């Protein structure tokens, strides 16, 4: 499994569980897996696999 272009240990769970475990707020991220955007409503249904390539974009506020 790779996350943002870096090797990551395979996580046996859902995308939502992965995001929560790694400190991401699911309402502040966009996730792409294998070239396709995963809509937020699907995060809890998407099972992660050892060969997944994820890109997680985290939005930050500021001014």
Regions found by a protein language model. Give the residues of each.
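Ubiquitin-like/PB1-type beta-grasp interaction modules and other compact soluble beta-rich domains
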Residues: 1-62
């Amino acid at each position: 499994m790779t996350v943002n272009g870096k090797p990551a240990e395979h996580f046996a769970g859902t995308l939502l569980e992965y995001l929560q475990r790694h400190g991401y707020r699911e309402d502040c991220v966009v996730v792409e897996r294998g070239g396709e955007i995963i809509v937020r409503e699907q995060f809890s249904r998407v099972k992660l696999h050892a060969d997944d390539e994820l890109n997680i974009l985290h939005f930050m506020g500021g001014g």
